[in-house]
Amino acid sequence: MSQFDRIHLVVLDSVGIGAAPDANDFVNAGVPDGASDTLGHISKTVGLAVPNMAKIGLGNIPRPQALKTVPAEESPSGYATKLQEVSLGKDTMTGHWEIMGLNITEPFDTFWNGFPEDIITKIEDFSGRKVIREANKPYSGTAVIDDFGPRQMETGELIIYTSADPVLQIAAHEDIIPLEELYRICEYARSITMERPALLGRIIARPYVGEPGNFTRTANRHDYAVSPFEDTVLNKLDQAGIDTYAVGKINDIFNGSGINHDMGHNKSNSHGIDTLIKTMGLSEFEKGFSFTNLVDFDALYGHRRDSHGYRDCLHEFDERLPEIISAMRDKDLLLITADHGNDPTYAGTDHTREYIPLLAYSPSFTGNGLIPVGHFADISATVADNFGVDTAMIGESFLQDLV
């Protein structure tokens, strides 16, 4: 019999808690990640007040130096620890796939200087359209259409850009490049990015409408992803007939594999929390697993190195955490974690190789304290242990520690 009827996993995208032991093997603008510390540096430089996460035990997580403005609790309401990544990457897909039990020994490719000319020219030759070279770099999805949408409307050129993750995105005005044509071009781009030196996790069609100065991305986005190379714990749950709910970009990250209820993309963290609470309230969701990604920390503030915005975003989540807890049932387990770091005080604009925090709370807990420091995949091993399914490639359950 399951210890918990439902487990809700919430990933605070990029909220790392200090450099991992191998952080110096990863770099940002030529600077090794060894001094990165997302939560620590935010707390130290701009202050961090997250009393609800602190109550569960955020300030109790072992660190070389305590979080400056997040005190340890004498008697926390839950359990806490930090987890180390073993996979050879620090991107979103690698982090999430490892959380669900995979060891990624061949990381996806990212393109901080834009895609190589041979990929761009292949897409041009296939599509019969030129590509705007100035857009070919990591770019905000809204900024790139503001900057190059007017030119696309005049010339019909393609807007191709990337991000910190292993993705190639093509933005196209629906009145200039019809959806079916955009999708066909994306399918071709997918076909030429399936192996090194350009092994990409996703190709994303990003259609938009409107006039210069008032462009709006539409709901006709389409992702061309790759599925995990082996079954994850999501697949094990699905195969056992256990409900799996995805909130935010989780469905995209796993290409729908192992997910039987996709609750849609988030417009913002707040919208994602609304969707999670709605999901938790579904009468038919009696037993199973929900998996939520809240990306604003990373997308809006980490990459932009905006410490104040990142702090405020953490405050907003913490203020809404009681609503999530109120939506829990007696035999629910809430797990709050991250997928990598993105220290807004650090060099460069890329993710940082860090430990991730783990907070565990249930109304049924009679104990509290620290869980031994482990690895990302311990989360999925615990989920598997609870529901009586097999683990994936890696991971050790800490279910026995939650009492």
Swiss-Prot record:
Cofactor notes: Binds 2 manganese ions.
GO terms (BP aspect): 2-deoxyribose 1-phosphate catabolic process; 5-phosphoribose 1-diphosphate biosynthetic process; metabolic compound salvage; nucleotide metabolic process
Location relative to the cell: Cytoplasm
Reaction(s) catalysed (UniProt annotation): 2-deoxy-alpha-D-ribose 1-phosphate = 2-deoxy-D-ribose 5-phosphate; alpha-D-ribose 1-phosphate = D-ribose 5-phosphate
Annotated EC: 5.4.2.7
Cofactor: Mn(2+)
UniProt keyword annotation of Transmembrane helix present: no
Binding site residues for Mn(2+) 1: D13, D339, H340
Signal peptide feature range: none
Gene Ontology CC terms: cytosol
UniProt keyword annotations, A-Z: Cytoplasm, Isomerase, Manganese, Metal-binding
Function: Isomerase that catalyzes the conversion of deoxy-ribose 1-phosphate (dRib-1-P) and ribose 1-phosphate (Rib-1-P) to deoxy-ribose 5-phosphate (dRib-5-P) and ribose 5-phosphate (Rib-5-P), respectively.
Family statement: Belongs to the phosphopentomutase family.
PANTHER family: PHOSPHOPENTOMUTASE
Name of the protein in its database record: Phosphopentomutase 1
Organism: Streptococcus agalactiae serotype Ia (strain ATCC 27591 / A909 / CDC SS700)
